[in-house]
Amino acid sequence: MNSQLIGILFSALLGAALGQRMRCYDCGGGPSNSCKQTVITCGEGERCGFLDRKPQPSSEQAKQPSATLSHHYPACVATHHCNQVAIESVGDVTFTTQKNCCFGDLCNGAVASSSTPLCILAAVTTLAWLLSGQ
């Protein structure tokens, strides 16, 4: 096989591997104590991560004790929001939400997957086989 064909084949396999969307744990925005983690496929431009939502102290929160709970849960996070802090208001309560991202499929759960995606494994194996045949 000529080197141009090898390059095209390798590029196609690598493109397929990189085009895969991440699989992440998600709680559907629910608090961590009621989370039934499900595995979802994140959208284009999203990564696995965690959301940490904490209320900011105020006099209104003293009247609403349930609003003083902090929440930590896994979710898909837009890549451009990774490692950012946002201030959000819900009714009379103001929350600080920190969005942290991690790398790899299912990296935001208690049991993370360390298996190599099949497309990458196939690309490396094919390239090694093609190069050894020359």
UniProtKB/Swiss-Prot annotation:
Signal peptide (residue range): 1-19
Disulfide bonds, paired cysteine numbers: C24-C48, C27-C35, C42-C76, C82-C101, C102-C107
Name of the gene: Ly6g6d
Classification via Pfam families: UPAR_LY6
Tree of life domain: Eukaryota
Gene3D superfamilies reported for this sequence: CD59 (2.10.60.10)
GO CC, alphabetical: external side of plasma membrane; protein-containing complex; synapse
Oxidoreductase in keyword set: no
Transmembrane residue ranges: none
Assembly, per entry: Homodimer.
GO terms classed as biological process: acetylcholine receptor signaling pathway
Topology within the bilayer: Lipid-anchor; GPI-anchor
Single GO molecular function: identical protein binding
Location within or outside the cell: Cell membrane
Chain residues in the propeptide: 109-134
Lipidation (GPI-anchor amidated asparagine): N108
Residues with attached carbohydrate: T68
Name of the protein: Lymphocyte antigen 6 complex locus protein G6d
InterPro entries recorded: LY6_UPA_recep-like (IPR016054), LY6G6d/LY6G6f (IPR026524), Snake_toxin-like_sf (IPR045860)
Entry keywords, A to Z: Cell membrane, Disulfide bond, Glycoprotein, GPI-anchor, Lipoprotein, Membrane, Signal
